[in-house]
Amino acid sequence: MRAIIIGIGQCGTKIADIFSLVDFEALAINTSKSDLEYLKHIPPERRILVGESIVGGKGVNANPLLGREAMKRDLPMVMKKISSLVGYEDVDIFFLTFGFGGGTGAGGTPVLAEALKEEYPDSLVVAIGALPLKEEGIRPTINAAITIDKLSRIVDSIIAIDNNKLKESDEDISQAYEKINYAIVERIASLLALIDVPGEQTLDASDLKFVLRAMGSFATVGYAKADATKIKSLSRLIIRSFENEGLYLDVNLESALYGLVAIHGPPEVLKAKEIFDALSELSQRIRGKQIFRGFYPDPREREVEVVTLLSGIYESKSIENIVITAKRYAREFMKAKEEGEMKKRELLKGLPDFEDIYPGEVDEG
């Protein structure tokens, strides 16, 4: 299976850079020249500066209108770079990594996603976006809600990561984001690494594409890992991967249409009964009842790793909170703006024009 990672904006390019570290094909697109130069693993020829004619390589200051315009203006250059990377080999999935709350990512990702859908109709386009932390305030929240709306009409699935679930209470934002970025890559990379790999029961690219072809609905990746010698119940470990503690998005599990579970570990631990008991519970709990599964016994492994992908999700508390909060902020802002305009008009009402005060002072002939 072939996947290409395209990072957009500061958050997205940092995530793509980590994917590049673990040998994925990756591109970085940003409006900030310094942010592109900061990357460590994506080769310079795969770093694309957009919007230089608008912001001079200095970023868009979390303004998605500028981010959108930057991507639109330089879209031919971007698509040419992508075409060069794609070459003559088919791409199964384009993963677009970005931050929902930023400017370049929130504004530019829908533009690029639409172009990719048109140029590569046989490839899936999947958005992987990090939701803003509560501490980040109003603007990122509004950016996120609007971007969710736009992307849901374009991409095949939106894998949303709720940063608020991952941030520890004593961490500052920069520490939290670094940990979150690595965690995102760990989960996605662990899943993709098992696609088309021989196993007791194998997941192939068509299985993954079926699960992610979900009409712009939400998806989430669950994860659980443990030392094989310390596992008392394999079923419990698998179940943990698709319960709230294992998921990076607060979702109503019962609303999911599809599930995909990959289990990797030493063969003596991968007991069939425990695996099927856990998968039976998952199939009973999700609405669609369709579970794809892969089992990968490996005598070299000392840990058991479980990756779960749930898609076709339309009910998520994390998403609802973002959208409801954004609507409230927007209403309050529009009300304050209207009240300010009214007060200004009331204050200035009745003032004369210059001609009323200085009649005949200027010879108009």
Swiss-Prot record:
<dbReference type="InterPro" id="IPR032907">
    <property type="entry name" value="CetZ"/>
</dbReference>
<dbReference type="Pfam" id="PF00091">
    <property type="entry name" value="Tubulin"/>
</dbReference>
<keyword id="KW-0342">GTP-binding</keyword>
<dbReference type="GO" id="GO:0051301">
    <property type="term" value="P:cell division"/>
</dbReference>
<feature type="binding site">
    <location>
        <begin position="103"/>
        <end position="105"/>
    </location>
    <ligand>
        <name>GTP</name>
    </ligand>
</feature>
<keyword id="KW-0547">Nucleotide-binding</keyword>
<dbReference type="GO" id="GO:0005525">
    <property type="term" value="F:GTP binding"/>
</dbReference>
<dbReference type="InterPro" id="IPR017975">
    <property type="entry name" value="Tubulin_CS"/>
</dbReference>
<feature type="binding site">
    <location>
        <position position="163"/>
    </location>
    <ligand>
        <name>GTP</name>
    </ligand>
</feature>
<keyword id="KW-0133">Cell shape</keyword>
<dbReference type="InterPro" id="IPR036525">
    <property type="entry name" value="Tubulin/FtsZ_GTPase_sf"/>
</dbReference>
<dbReference type="InterPro" id="IPR003008">
    <property type="entry name" value="Tubulin_FtsZ_GTPase"/>
</dbReference>
<dbReference type="InterPro" id="IPR048737">
    <property type="entry name" value="CetZ_C"/>
</dbReference>
<dbReference type="GO" id="GO:0032153">
    <property type="term" value="C:cell division site"/>
</dbReference>
<dbReference type="InterPro" id="IPR045061">
    <property type="entry name" value="FtsZ/CetZ"/>
</dbReference>
<dbReference type="Pfam" id="PF21011">
    <property type="entry name" value="CetZ_C"/>
</dbReference>
<protein>
    <recommendedName>
        <fullName>Tubulin-like protein CetZ</fullName>
    </recommendedName>
</protein>
<feature type="binding site">
    <location>
        <begin position="10"/>
        <end position="14"/>
    </location>
    <ligand>
        <name>GTP</name>
    </ligand>
</feature>
<dbReference type="GO" id="GO:0005874">
    <property type="term" value="C:microtubule"/>
</dbReference>
<dbReference type="GO" id="GO:0005737">
    <property type="term" value="C:cytoplasm"/>
</dbReference>
<feature type="binding site">
    <location>
        <position position="181"/>
    </location>
    <ligand>
        <name>GTP</name>
    </ligand>
</feature>
<comment type="function">
    <text>Involved in cell shape control.</text>
</comment>
<dbReference type="GO" id="GO:0008360">
    <property type="term" value="P:regulation of cell shape"/>
</dbReference>
<feature type="binding site">
    <location>
        <position position="136"/>
    </location>
    <ligand>
        <name>GTP</name>
    </ligand>
</feature>
<keyword id="KW-0963">Cytoplasm</keyword>
<comment type="similarity">
    <text>Belongs to the CetZ family.</text>
</comment>
<dbReference type="GO" id="GO:0007017">
    <property type="term" value="P:microtubule-based process"/>
</dbReference>
<dbReference type="GO" id="GO:0003924">
    <property type="term" value="F:GTPase activity"/>
</dbReference>
